[in-house]
Amino acid sequence: MAMSNMTYNNVFDHAYEMLKENIRYDDIRDTDDLHDAIHMAADNAVPHYYADIFSVMASEGIDLEFEDSGLMPDTKDVIRILQARIYEQLTIDLWEDAEDLLNEYLEEVEEYEEDEE
């Protein structure tokens, strides 16, 4: 039986790359438009398999406690609670990097537009 080696950093890296792609694909040019892209990336990166969920929660980079207790789902299903916690941490961490990713994209767009002139 193979053990899951998924860490929070693996999940975050995947979400980060998805956010980067979302910014480019949706041609996001304003921080006000980042909300949907961040939540889409976080939602897609949250693991679904029990072993992966427990592995992520056991890894460094994520606390057990919710930052906003209002986000804790009203359920006794431990898996859903852990997934919600991973999702919350991903959105927090992605927001920290989102502006840098957006600025990087805007610089690329500006260079491309200057080259076309």
UniProtKB/Swiss-Prot annotation:
InterPro entries in UniProt: B-form_Ocr (IPR036207), Ocr (IPR014798)
Superkingdom per UniProt: Viruses
Gene Ontology annotations of biological process type: symbiont-mediated evasion of host restriction-modification system; symbiont-mediated suppression of host innate immune response
Pfam families: ocr
Keyword list, A-Z: Early protein, Host-virus interaction, Inhibition of host innate immune response by virus, Restriction-modification system evasion by virus, Viral immunoevasion
General function of this protein: Prevents both degradation and modification of T7 DNA by the host restriction-modification complex. Structural mimic of the phosphate backbone of B-form DNA that binds to and completely occupies the DNA-binding sites of all known families of the complex type I DNA restriction enzymes. Thereby, inhibits the restriction endonuclease activity and protects the phage genome as it penetrates into host cytoplasm. Inhibits host transcription by binding to the bacterial RNAP and competing with sigma factors. Inhibits the host exclusion defense system BREX.
Subunit (UniProt): Homodimer. Interacts with HsdM (AC P08957), the M subunit of host type I methyltransferase restriction enzyme M.EcoKI; 1 Ocr dimer binds to M.EcoKI. Interacts with HsdR (AC P08956), the R subunit of host type I bifunctional endonuclease and methyltransferase restriction enzyme R.EcoKI; 2 Ocr dimers binds to R.EcoKI. Interacts with host PglX/BrxX (AC P0DUF9); this interaction inhibits the enzymatic activity of PglX/BrxX through high-affinity binding. Forms a 2:2 tetrameric complex with phage T7 OCR.
Identification of the protein by name: Protein Ocr
Organism field: Escherichia phage T7 (Bacteriophage T7)
Species lineage: Viruses, Duplodnaviria, Heunggongvirae, Uroviricota, Caudoviricetes
